[in-house]
Regions:
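Short hydrophobic alpha-helix segments
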Residues: 136-137
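RNase H-like two-metal-ion nuclease catalytic core shared by retroviral integrases
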Residues: 25, 164-168, 172-181, 188-211, ...
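C-terminal domain-tail junction helix/linker
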Residues: 182-184, 208-290
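Basic, flexible linker segments flanking DNA-binding modules
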Residues: 7, 11-104, 195, 249-258
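Mobile genetic element proteins and their domesticated derivatives, centered on retroelements
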Residues: 6-10, 17, 33-34, 49, ...
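Mobile-element integrase/transposase regions
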Residues: 59-126, 144-150, 157-162, 270-290
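Short, surface-exposed connector motifs at secondary-structure boundaries
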Residues: 45, 130-132, 158-163
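Hydrophobic beta-strand scaffold residues
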Residues: 76, 187-188
Length: 290
C-alpha cells in the first residue's frame, strides 16, 4: 500500500509523515543555563528560573523553559499548604494592612542547630510592604535587651516603623521592650495567641529561609551561621525573584552597611561572595570560620 493511499484511508495529511523536529540553535546553551540555575538554586521552580534567565539577557518565555524543565526531568518544588486568609471576601481587613515602606515591620524567631546539636535562635525582621529582609541576627540565647539592641541597629539605618507585628513570645511582650518601642514612636501589633497566620508575611519568609538555606547547610560555629545567614539575606533582597513582586527582588538597590555597630554585616563583608552570575550566598571554604 502506498503512503498516499494509507494517509487517505486514515484521513491524515501526508505532511505529518515527513515532519522532523527542528532544534533551535540556542537550545543546547539554554538547556545548560537552565540546568545550571536549577542546580545552583535547588528550590526554585521554572518561573523563577525564567526571571533569572531574562535578567541574563535571554529572550525566552516561561512555556519554553517549562518544556525544557520537564524534558530534563527537573523537579518543581511542591506547593505549600495554604495559610489562613488575611482578608475577608468583601475586602474588609482582618488585620493591619501594610501600605508603604516602614508602615509595618514584622519579626519572629527561627530555630536552627550547629553540628554539635546546640540550638541557635535567629531573629528575622522584614518590611511587610517591600518584603525586604531588614535583619537576620543569630544568638544562642535572647533577652528583651538583645532584641532592643538588634532593633536599634536597624532603625538607625532604616528609620522607625509605624507598627511592629509579632507573636506573644516572652521577648516580644517584655515590659522593657514595650517601653522602649513606645519611646521611639513605634506601635506594637500583637497577633492572637495560637494564630501564626496573622503574621503571614514573616511566617512565609521563615519557611523560605528554612527551605532554601537552613535545610541545606551544616553549621560548625556561630560565626559561620552569622556570615552565611547575612549572605543569604543579601541574596534574598537583591537577587532572588519574588513571585508577589512580579518576580523582582525586594530591594535590588540594597547594599551592605559597613559600620554603625552591625557586627554580623561587617563580618560578612570581609568574605566576598562567590563569583557566580547570580551572587550565590555560599562561599568557598572559609578556613577562618573553623
Amino acid at each position: 500500500m502506498s503512503e498516499r493511499w494509507a494517509c487517505r484511508l486514515v484521513n491524515q495529511p501526508r505532511g505529518t509523515q515527513r515532519y522532523h523536529l527542528t532544534r533551535r540553535e540556542d537550545e543546547d546553551a539554554l538547556t545548560r543555563a537552565i540546568t545550571d540555575l536549577a542546580t545552583q538554586y535547588g528550590r526554585y521552580g521554572y518561573r523563577r528560573i525564567t526571571a533569572l534567565l531574562k535578567r541574563d539577557g535571554w529572550q525566552v518565555g516561561k512555556d519554553r523553559v517549562e518544556r525544557i524543565w520537564r524534558r530534563e526531568g527537573l523537579k518543581v518544588p511542591p506547593r505549600q499548604k495554604p495559610r489562613g486568609r488575611l482578608w475577608f471576601n468583601d475586602g474588609s481587613c482582618v488585620r493591619l494592612r501594610p501600605e508603604h515602606p516602614n508602615h509595618v515591620w514584622s519579626y519572629d524567631f527561627v530555630s536552627a542547630k550547629t553540628h554539635d546539636g546546640r540550638t541557635v535562635r535567629m531573629l528575622n525582621l522584614i518590611d511587610e510592604h517591600s518584603r525586604e529582609c531588614l535583619m537576620i541576627r543569630s544568638e544562642r540565647r535572647w533577652s528583651s535587651a538583645k532584641v532592643i539592641e538588634a532593633l536599634a541597629d536597624v532603625m538607625v539605618l532604616k528609620g522607625v516603623p509605624e507598627h511592629l507585628r509579632s507573636d506573644n513570645g516572652p521577648e516580644f511582650v517584655a515590659r522593657d521592650l514595650r517601653k522602649w518601642l513606645a519611646g521611639t514612636g513605634a506601635k506594637t501589633a500583637y497577633i492572637e495567641p495560637g494564630s501564626p497566620w496573622e503574621n503571614g508575611y514573616c511566617e512565609s519568609f521563615n519557611s523560605k529561609l528554612r527551605d532554601e538555606f537552613l535545610n541545606g547547610e551544616l553549621f560548625y560555629s556561630m560565626k559561620e551561621i552569622r556570615v552565611l545567614a547575612e549572605r543569604w539575606r543579601v541574596h534574598y533582597n537583591t537577587i532572588r525573584p519574588h513571585s508577589s513582586l512580579g518576580y523582582r527582588p525586594p530591594a535590588p538597590e540594597a547594599r551592605l552597611p559597613k559600620s554603625l555597630g552591625y557586627g554580623e554585616v561587617e563580618t560578612a563583608t570581609r568574605f566576598p561572595l562567590l563569583h557566580t552570575p547570580h551572587g550565590d550566598y555560599r562561599s568557598t571554604k572559609i578556613d577562618a570560620l573553623h
